[in-house]
């Protein structure tokens, strides 16, 4: 597997967020020199882009100076605000929940990442994009997918399978959205297709209905063949990184009193299949009949 990275654009995500670090443009700039870094990840701070926030602009300019991609995150952005956001150099968006939103961004030159994850599922709404008219600027993504879903359903292959069998998308268009379009967008120009000059990274499936993988080739070498995995040299994991990965929660002992608060708090309404929330007023207590439950964010980095 080749693992590629997009550098974080919004850590912390908001001024009130307590993250493990504060990554300004100086903290991430040197990482652009790594060949596996493809660009700047989802620019969530659309307000900062539109209003020329100096820190946001510095991150965008740094990415452009290294000739890297800048991914977007701008649900519902419209009109002149969307014009400004795209003109700043944001090349794609994965937060489209409606055809109207997706078409507005396509018309301005963005690529659309059609998301079908665990919580946010937009394939049904955006499947009409997968036609010769629009598909060349569309690709698939999951954004967030739970490990159990990965094991039971699959990843990008699941989206392609659903597009073909549930929404009637042409199989060739679906496979291109899963492979070739994404490779082209990220400037991985020798991947995503079987052709002269391309790396021979590809899988052989049984049919478009089941998408069962029969063979997997990596750089022309057959590594998976009908249930048998060829031996390969696994990379060594540095002890330092292993220790860091298992030492990420630094939380003081919590008690019920830590979660008691009689003040009025905002109520977030949920939309099935989306991660966008609605403003449902205020409440000062849990109400099971109205399905008002309490949520809390516990800072885990500093303890």
Give the location of each predicted region:
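Short coil/turn connectors at secondary-structure junctions
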Residues: 1-3, 34-37, 65-68, 88, ...
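Active-site microenvironment of metallo-dependent hydrolases
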Residues: 151-168, 172-303
